[in-house]
Amino acid sequence: RFLIPIFLILHFSLNAIEYNLSWYPKDNYFDSINTPTNLKYSLINTDGVWEDNKGSYGVMNCLVSLLTKNSKETELNGLCQANDESKDEAKFWITLKRNSLETTGVGKITYIAVTGIYKKVIGMSCPYAVTYVQKTYAIIKQKCSVEFFNKLN
C-alpha cells in the first residue's frame, strides 16, 4: 500500500530533468567604434555547433550587438537561428540578452520563433552563462526548467 506512492514519487523525481543546451561559437566578424569617454559599440557575427541533453545537435548563427561602458559593463542583444540536424530539420530562433561584465556573464535566452519539435516552447525563456576562451571563442551553457524539457517530448 505504501509502496505505490513511494514509487510514484521516485518515478517523477527521477524523470524531472532540466533541459541543458551547450553552444560553442566562434566570432567570424567583429567591428567596433570607441569613444574617448570609454563607450564602445560592437557588432559580432558568430556561429558554432550546439548540443543538448536530449541528443539533439546542430549549427547556430547569431548577430550580436554589444554596448560597453567604462570597459566593463556590457549590454548585449542578439538574434540567433539554430538548425537541428538531428530532428526532422526543426529550427528555432532565439534572442540573447545580457547586462554584465564584458568578459563573462549571465543572461536570458528567449525562444521567439520555432518549427518542428520546438513548437511548444515558443515564448519561453531560460538563463544562460557565457565564458570566453581567448578572444574569439566562447562556451555558452543554457539551463531550462523541467517544464521546458517535458514540452520537447
Give names to the regions the model predicted.
Residues 11-13:
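N-terminal signal peptide c-region/cleavage motif recognized by signal peptidases
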Residues 1-6:
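Sec-dependent signal peptide recognition
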Residues 16-153:
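Beta-strand-enriched cores of mature, soluble protein domains
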